[in-house]
Amino acid sequence: MFALTFLGTSASVPSAERNHPALLVEAAGKRILIDCGEGTQRQLLRSGAGFRRLDRILLTHAHLDHVLGIPGLFSTLGLRQSSDVMTIHGGPGTLDIVIRMLAGLWGAGRAPIPVEFAALSEGQVIDAGGFTIDCFPVRHRDTDSFGFVFQSPARRHLLPDRLASLGVPDGPLRGELAQGRPVVIEDGRTIDPEDVLGPATGGRKLVVIGDTETTEGLSQYVADADMLVIEATFLDRDASIARDYGHLTAAEAAAFAAANNVGQLVLTHMSGRYEDEEILAEAARIFPNSRIAADFDHIVV
């Protein structure tokens, strides 16, 4: 299960209702921030999420609307005397920009809190403990952009009727079987896990894509996702402008979701030039299970 809190859902120009991009993903006791636009620290407080156990930031790219909140967040964490190491993941070019930004404020190699930088590469898999994050390249203007696949493992559960019929008693033996190890019961019979485990269920797949100028080549990462979070900065009537600025239209995002058997489509990176109803209508005509994210929306997948 992944719990998402949308902290910022605007395009490059924020509005009174929408902050610069940031998304909090929580799973298996971990809390991961995707992008950190200006004002993200206040959005964390306003959402009720706060700063606790926040130790990893994934950056889609280094355009300023996605990274300017990092210095303010770090300054506040430093004032709170946080000793936790913050790991920032991003493409090499993205990290170079962030490192130079921090150096301009606090000096080379310095920051208010301990920081580690981890460069992303195509095909890299981050083991977050309880789930994985696959990283894949995305095309957006002159940046080294990345998208992310959050995957929780499907699990097989013990079948009570089978345990009872085979005479497996309550206790440690059942725990061994649940871990996939055969056991020998009191009468000498060996019980194999395959005899008492049901089919794998419960795995979840969440895909988050930030700014992107095309969905070409991305189907292999998005196919069969339970949820796709992706930008929809323009309407289809302005597709030529979308190309000029390296963004998608709502229709393109919806067609991409429909072609890849996505469960739910969540659109973000909203431009103030359109009404939400226009954007949603364009997407829903193609992919009915679409919604537009608003700041402080909380969605569980």
Swiss-Prot record:
Binding positions for Zn(2+) 1 per the UniProt entry: H61, H63, H140, D211
The protein's name: Ribonuclease Z
Cofactor binding, note field: Binds 2 Zn(2+) ions.
Protein source organism: Bradyrhizobium diazoefficiens (strain JCM 10833 / BCRC 13528 / IAM 13628 / NBRC 14792 / USDA 110)
Organism lineage: Bacteria, Pseudomonadati, Pseudomonadota, Alphaproteobacteria, Hyphomicrobiales
One function term, GO molecular function aspect: 3'-tRNA processing endoribonuclease activity
Family: Belongs to the RNase Z family.
The UniProt record lists the keyword Lyase: no
UniProt keyword Aminoacyl-tRNA synthetase present: no
Assembly and binders: Homodimer.
Substrates-to-products reaction catalysed: Endonucleolytic cleavage of RNA, removing extra 3' nucleotides from tRNA precursor, generating 3' termini of tRNAs. A 3'-hydroxy group is left at the tRNA terminus and a 5'-phosphoryl group is left at the trailer molecule
Function: Zinc phosphodiesterase, which displays some tRNA 3'-processing endonuclease activity. Probably involved in tRNA maturation, by removing a 3'-trailer from precursor tRNA.
Binding locations of Zn(2+) 2: D65, H66, D211, H269
Keyword annotations of the record: Endonuclease, Hydrolase, Metal-binding, Nuclease, tRNA processing, Zinc
Cofactors required: Zn(2+)
